[in-house]
């Protein structure tokens, strides 16, 4: 058995994107847009097939009417709350909205039932349309690769990402959530890929093979400087930095039919094991403010880790609560003491016994993210003021041409994106008008604020995610079994929004703190670390444990009282912390002897 792993290498921040790479990103973007167009046309044709059946068409008419009623009532409720400056409004109006949503839900189910009746009859027509979609997608390969310059591995990567997005959207629709594919403009970001082909029985594509300048894959991917991981662990940090600075050579499509390569100055932080079988690599280019960043992701197959069979059982329950030190995102408990590193004890809190505690996202991260939001707010206000100035100037003067056409004040009044005004500032920079100086002064300041905003946000989120990875590493190094609850943060958030009576500003502040803490990210890091290190992971249903008192076993009612902490148990009358009770029950269920 083997496991897939991805090693990421950062590309030097001063590296300039070559024109051949920019062209490949542009082709990959156009391919993705064509795939979206084909999929949207397929969805429309599939809907037309269902609508051709009278019963389904009638159900769709009913659903459309119910949806229109629900939207209209939602707007009335929204307006009533604005006028009342409170969540508490007419009970009759809110009941009408609930009834409208219930009718819409029933109408959607009626359509699904009508489709189920004619599903077999429409099978041939659906299959024919699916075959046509597959043929259209296949034809794009000839357009972009055989007759164009896009590298075939990049084509496969874009197509795989597209199919993954289609499956995700189908799953969201099946759960009743609105979702659809959208077109995007090209901003210079994207992904290109290479794949290392190997015939059955051929030697593995090991790091040593890729480090060989005369190796089999030298014209696809060459990663020099490989160091055995055991030797790497014995090197100092300075030695690792120096040894890890290598230049990767990677295939990058073609220009007029001629193969092209690019050189990537990367920093390696860890090396793959000697027996790893490297299957390919992706160069991911992202845009941070107005600057491009790149990273190289190398994918490989490695042998499975030996499963862990000894160690304490650790239970982890997600949530979010405000504390003096930050936002508590989880409660944990172990059946044996855990050794928490000194540097993490302010984040992974532990009691005197060393068997339980909470995980807290430091308040400094919240303050840093709040600062970036304040910068974004300042930029938005400055943009509004600039828009008014440009509109006023255009109303009183004859405007210079913009993109070979006169620019109207009514057009600029509709602009919302800062990029539009930045483009206008560049276009009118040297025309000698008063408005050009105003535009350029705004652009010069906004560019700096945008960089501060995005870099500050990126660093704060990176700090949070790194803390989560460190916590996951601490648990995986010591635990023999990990229990994680299946609490859905999104569902809890939506439920809280529906029932809250707090002012909108207060609720938005709570939502921002929850989003900044991202409890789900901690669970993802823990599960990934356990899977990598061979530690068994069990997902525990949170449905009953959240309301059960661990001391007396009483299951309390599911009402709003139990959103606060602590609460009083209706069974024994004692006050208790429901989060600590939850992890206690998780451990008790895991260690209880199974019935024969």
Curated annotation (Swiss-Prot):
DNA-binding listed as a keyword: yes
GO annotation terms (biological process): defense response to virus
Annotated cofactor note: Binds only 1 Mg(2+) as opposed to 2 usually seen in other Cas12 enzymes; lack of the second Mg(2+) results in loss of target DNA cleavage activity. Binds 1 Zn(2+) within the target nucleic-acid binding (TNB) domain.
Domain of life: Bacteria
Consequence of substituting residue 141 to A: Loss of target DNA-binding in vitro
Region of interest (Recognition domain (REC1-C)), ranges: 122-190
Region (RuvC-II): 578-596
GO-annotated molecular function: DNA binding; metal ion binding; RNA binding
Chain positions covered by the region annotation RuvC-I: 314-541
Sites where the protein binds Zn(2+): 549, 552, 569, 572
Additional information: Part of a type V-M CRISPR-Cas system.
Annotated region described as Recognition domain (REC2), given as residue ranges: 54-121
Residues forming coiled coils: 55-83, 91-117
Annotated organism of origin: Mycolicibacterium mucogenicum
Protein name: CRISPR-associated DNA-binding protein Cas12m
């Amino acid at each position: 058995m083997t496991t897939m792993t991805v090693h990421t290498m950062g590309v030097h921040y001063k590296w300039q994107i070559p024109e051949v790479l920019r062209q490949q990103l542009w082709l990959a973007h156009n391919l993705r847009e064509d795939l979206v167009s084909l999929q949207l046309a397929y969805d429309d044709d599939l809907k037309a097939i269902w609508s051709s059946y009278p019963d389904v068409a009638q159900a769709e008419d009913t659903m459309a009417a119910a949806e229109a009623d629900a939207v209209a009532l939602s707007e009335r409720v929204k307006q009533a709350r604005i006028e009342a400056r409170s969540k508490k409004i007419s009970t009759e109006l809110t009941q009408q909205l609930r009834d409208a949503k219930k009718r819409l839900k029933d109408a959607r189910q009626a359509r699904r039932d009508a489709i189920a009746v004619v599903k077999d009859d429409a099978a041939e027509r659906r299959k024919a349309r699916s075959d046509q979609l597959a043929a259209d997608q296949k034809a794009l390969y000839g357009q972009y690769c055989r007759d164009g310059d896009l590298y075939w591995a990049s084509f496969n990567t874009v197509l795989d990402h597209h199919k993954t997005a289609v499956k995700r959207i189908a799953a969201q629709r099946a759960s009743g959530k609105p979702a659809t594919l959208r077109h995007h403009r090209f901003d210079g970001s994207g992904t290109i890929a290479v794949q290392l082909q190997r015939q059955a029985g051929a030697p593995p594509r090991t790091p040593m093979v890729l480090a060989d300048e005369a190796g089999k894959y030298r014209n696809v991917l060459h990663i020099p400087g490989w160091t055995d991981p055991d030797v790497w662990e014995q090197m100092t940090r300075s030695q690792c930095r120096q040894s890890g600075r290598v230049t990767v050579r990677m295939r990058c499509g073609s220009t007029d039919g001629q193969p092209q390569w690019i050189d990537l100055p990367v920093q390696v932080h860890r090396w793959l094991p000697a027996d790893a079988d490297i299957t390919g690599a992706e160069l991911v280019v992202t845009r941070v403010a107005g600057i491009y960043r790149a990273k190289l992701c190398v994918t490989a197959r490695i042998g499975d880790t030996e499963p862990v069979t000894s160690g304490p059982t650790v239970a982890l329950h997600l949530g979010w609560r405000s504390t003096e030190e930050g936002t508590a995102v989880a409660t944990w408990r172990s059946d044996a003491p855990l050794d928490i590193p000194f540097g993490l004890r302010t984040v992974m809190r532990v009691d005197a016994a060393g068997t339980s505690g909470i995980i807290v996202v430091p308040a400094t991260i919240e303050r840093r993210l709040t600062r970036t939001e304040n910068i974004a707010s300042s930029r938005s206000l400055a943009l509004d003021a600039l828009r008014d100035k440009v509109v006023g100037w255009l109303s009183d003067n004859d405007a210079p041409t913009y993109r070979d056409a006169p620019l109207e004040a009514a057009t600029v009044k509709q602009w919302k994106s800062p990029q539009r005004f930045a483009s206008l500032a560049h276009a009118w920079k040297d025309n000698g008008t008063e408005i050009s100086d105003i535009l350029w002064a705004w652009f010069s300041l906004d560019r700096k604020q945008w960089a501060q905003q995005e870099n500050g946000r990126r660093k704060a989120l990176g700090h949070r995610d790194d803390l989560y990875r460190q916590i996951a590493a601490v648990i995986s190094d010591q635990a023999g079994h990990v229990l994680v609850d299946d609490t859905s943060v999104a569902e809890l958030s939506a439920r809280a929004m529906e029932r809250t009576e707090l002012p909108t500003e207060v609720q938005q502040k709570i939502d921002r703190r929850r989003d900044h803490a991202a409890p789900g990210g901690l669970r993802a890091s823990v599960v990934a670390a356990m899977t990598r290190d061979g530690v068994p992971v069990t997902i525990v249903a949170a449905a009953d444990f959240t309301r059960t008192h661990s001391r007396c076993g009483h299951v309390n009612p599911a009402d709003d009282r139990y959103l606060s902490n602590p609460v009083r148990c209706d069974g024994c009358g004692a006050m208790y912390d429901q989060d600590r009770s939850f992890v206690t029950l998780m451990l008790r269920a895991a260690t209880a002897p199974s019935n024969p």
